[in-house]
Each structure stands twice: as C-alpha cells, then as structure tokens.
Amino acid sequence: MERTEFEIPGGIPPRRHGGTGRDPDTSVDANIQPDDVEAEVTLRPRSLDEFIGQPKVRDQLSLVLTGAKKRGVVPDHVLLSGPPGLGKTTMAMIIAQELGTSLRMTSGPALERAGDLAAMLSNLMEGDVLFIDEIHRIARPAEEMLYMAMEDFRIDVIVGKGPGATSIPLEIPPFTLVGATTRSGMLTGPLRDRFGFTAQMEFYDVADLTRVVKRTARILEVGIDADAAVEIASRSRGTPRIANRLLRRVRDFAEVHADGHITLGAANAALIVFDVDELGLDRLDRAVLDALVRGHGGGPVGVNTLAVAVGEEPATVEEVCEPYLVRAGMIARTGRGRVATAAAWRHLGLEPPEGTIGDY
C-alpha cells in the first residue's frame, strides 16, 4: 500500500523495547486513555444484525435464540472462546438484549467461594443471562456448585459446620449462563460438557475490520478517508477492540496536528507515534521477537523465559502476544518451546540462519 508522508512536529519518537505492564485483556498497551472503557461500551453493537464479523457464530446463535423464544424456554448455556477483544462480552450483552432480559456480569476470579456464586444465583430472575468472564479461572468449589445450577436450576446451600452441617436445597429460576474464556483448554470436562452451545470467536479479516473502523468513526462523528480506514484496520491484529482504540488515537493525532479529518497520511504518522508498525506489532510484540531472535538465537525458548526477558507476566505473553504472532507466522510453538520463524528474523531486519522454520 502506498505510504503518504505526514510531518510530525518534534520528530518521531524512537521505538523502545521493554515491559509495558499490559493486562492480558487489553491489547494495544500504553496508549489506553481514561475514557477508553466508557467509549468501548458506547461503541458496542446492540443486536446480532449490528454485530460486524463472526458470521458463522452470529447465524448459529440466532438459531439458538430464535428457537428458544419460539418454544418459550430459556436458551441453552453458551460458551464463547477466543483471544481478547473479539467481542465475547459484547455478544453476551447482545444475547440478553435479543431475549429482552437482564444481564448479570461477573468474572471467574471474583468467584472464589461457593458462597460468592450462591449469592449471585439467588438474585437471578427467570430468564436472566448470567455472564461469567474468564470462566476458566473460577474456583473449584464455585465450579462444582455451578454444575447443579446449570443442569437442574438448583443449588445446595450448606448451613453450619462439622457434623451438624445440613444441606438446604435452593431452587433458582431458569437462566442462561454465558461463559467467556481465552483459554478453553483450561476448562474442566464436566464444565465444558454442560454448555449446550459453544462458539470459537475468530480473528477478523481486514474487510470486516474496515467496516468496524468506519462504523466507529460515524459514531464518534469523525471524518475518515476510505484508505485511512483500511490502513488502521490492517494494523489492528484482526481485533475490533484494537481497531477502535487505534482509531481513537489517530483521531487525537488528527485533531492536534491537522484539521481533525483522518487522511491516510495522518493515520500513518499517528501509528508511527504510537509505535504500531505495518503488521500491527507494537513494542511488546517486537520485544518478544527480539528476545527470541537476538537473545536466544531463534529458540526454542519457554514462555516463562520469554516473559522474564521482556519484563511481563507469562500470561500476558501467552494470551496477548502469542496468538497473533503465531497467526502472523512469526512464532512457531513446538514441544520444546517457542521458535522464531524466518519471517520474524526478517521483520527485525536480520537474515535467518539456514534451516529456520519458514525459510524456503
């Protein structure tokens, strides 16, 4: 794609490697602004028809919800899997909206004891949607209580301690559980089997991400050229959350250094300022590649070693960086550890050694 030059007052800041302190549930790190969380809520689609991308999941989910409404019953429990930022939380909100019911939200780490889950379940109304994010991190006592709740719509509450403890059955109204996970392999078999519908959220292609960028620009009332929307989409790592975040940062740049309208030149210049390269890799991604290639000769290297090298938590490297780097053909996961491909070497401006994966 042709690059348009755009002068940046004060010059372009140098790229730096190192830790970013990113949370595994966020993607383009250091450029998160205080109003971003509120903005993401505002930008969420409110129906399956508004939801862009994931056509297979949308069609399947539409059948599940429509069939349940026609029968007058609550839909089967839903499990949504996939990397962060692909719309799992949004899809849970849409399910509640499509059913015309309330959405109750919590997360796996918040359910440390069975009592935490019992309190939430006892407050549900008939037909409510209960959304548990990071459901793979739910504590075992709460998970075991969830089995009965999902299957029989009742729980057993233990009153007292020791030999005098008694179990009191508590009926709960029929509800639909929507679980979201970035690590479906960490779910136990009994929990996974209780979901009637499971869906894998896939990375977006550039065409769908361009539609996301244009829709967001309309909502934010920002003018944007078509080629600028494509450029932002192509650097968004296949992830709508990143596309929206990059658009807001490009908007900031255009308002400060131009007339507020986003051109291709403004988009390119802004993305350089915010350290996002042509493939959508940011500082942490390049730090991982640099540690793997320059620090360990291309690998194989374990994820814990890589995390120490870049100053991040292993979960951040594994859940945020790796999915896209593997998809982009930069890293191969082997039984002995992570290995840099020829594409990773060349992306860093280095010639890959003979025999490197992907060097044809």
Swiss-Prot record:
Native source species: Corynebacterium efficiens (strain DSM 44549 / YS-314 / AJ 12310 / JCM 11189 / NBRC 100395)
Task: List residues binding DNA.
Answer: R333, R338
Q: What is its main location?
A: cytoplasm
Q: The organism's lineage? A: Bacteria, Bacillati, Actinomycetota, Actinomycetes, Mycobacteriales
Q: How does it assemble?
A: Homohexamer. Forms an RuvA(8)-RuvB(12)-Holliday junction (HJ) complex. HJ DNA is sandwiched between 2 RuvA tetramers; dsDNA enters through RuvA and exits via RuvB. An RuvB hexamer assembles on each DNA strand where it exits the tetramer. Each RuvB hexamer is contacted by two RuvA subunits (via domain III) on 2 adjacent RuvB subunits; this complex drives branch migration. In the full resolvosome a probable DNA-RuvA(4)-RuvB(12)-RuvC(2) complex forms which resolves the HJ.
Protein name per the record:
Holliday junction branch migration complex subunit RuvB
Provide the residue span(s) of the region labelled Small ATPAse domain (RuvB-S). Answer: 205-275
Q: What is known of its domains?
A: Has 3 domains, the large (RuvB-L) and small ATPase (RuvB-S) domains and the C-terminal head (RuvB-H) domain. The head domain binds DNA, while the ATPase domains jointly bind ATP, ADP or are empty depending on the state of the subunit in the translocation cycle. During a single DNA translocation step the structure of each domain remains the same, but their relative positions change.
Statement: the UniProt record of this protein carries the keyword Signal: no
Report the Pfam families cross-referenced here: AAA_lid_4, RuvB_C, RuvB_N
Q: Which SUPFAM superfamilies match?
A: P-loop containing nucleoside triphosphate hydrolases, Winged helix' DNA-binding domain
**Matching CDD domains:** AAA
Residues binding Mg(2+) are T89
